Regions:
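Conserved active-site and cofactor/substrate-binding residues in soluble primary-metabolism enzymes
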Residues: 40, 44, 82, 125
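Residues that cap or initiate secondary-structure elements
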Residues: 34, 81-83, 123
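N-terminal accessory/pre-domain segments preceding catalytic cores
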Residues: 1-23
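Glycine- and Gly-Pro-enriched alpha-helical subdomains that act as flexible
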Residues: 19-59
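Compact, glycine-rich, soluble single-domain proteins
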Residues: 46, 51-82, 93
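Short amphipathic alpha-helices within nucleic acid-binding modules
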Residues: 83-89
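Short basic, glycine-rich beta-strand/loop surfaces that mediate nucleic-acid
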Residues: 2-7, 28-29, 68-79, 92-137
């Protein structure tokens, strides 16, 4: 999908096959083992949010529309690298979209380090089952 098509889809009137009263969110889970600074976490979370939005627009546009029209809720949580990888496996088995962000290694942390995984956008209940036990960032 080109940039022009993507922008048009974001600004066009929305139609959705999903339940109108359903609530959707995007969950960003930070690799807390890396001890990143606040700015680094913000930048990596931004990368994850944008990447998840673009990926969802290409694969499940109706779900993206539902999330965009329901307020674009985002939640930032933290966990260890080991648990983050386990959550990713569970999400894939459940059909929840995931997006990995690996750092380029130009500032605080080694190149290739897994900094954050975005889960969703998906219905709140699905993500709550997966990540509800994690602590807020």
């Amino acid at each position: 999908m080109g940039l022009r098509s993507f922008i048009h889809r974001l600004s066009a009137p929305k139609t959705s096959d999903f339940v109108p009263n359903a609530s959707f969110k995007l969950v960003l889970v930070i690799n807390h083992d890396l001890k990143m600074g606040k700015g680094k976490i913000a930048a990596q979370s931004g990368h994850a949010s944008v990447s998840a939005t673009v990926k969802m627009g290409a694969s499940k546009p109706n779900l993206l529309d539902a999330w965009l029209t329901s307020g674009q809720k985002k939640v930032c949580l933290k966990t260890t690298l080991d648990e983050l990888l386990e959550l990713e496996k569970e999400a894939v088995k459940s059909g929840i979209q995931t997006v990995r962000i690996n750092d380029a290694g130009k500032t605080q942390i080694p190149s290739g380090s897994l900094t954050v995984i975005a889960f969703g956008p998906a219905q709140d209940g699905e993500l709550e089952q997966l990540t509800g036990h994690l602590k807020l960032l």
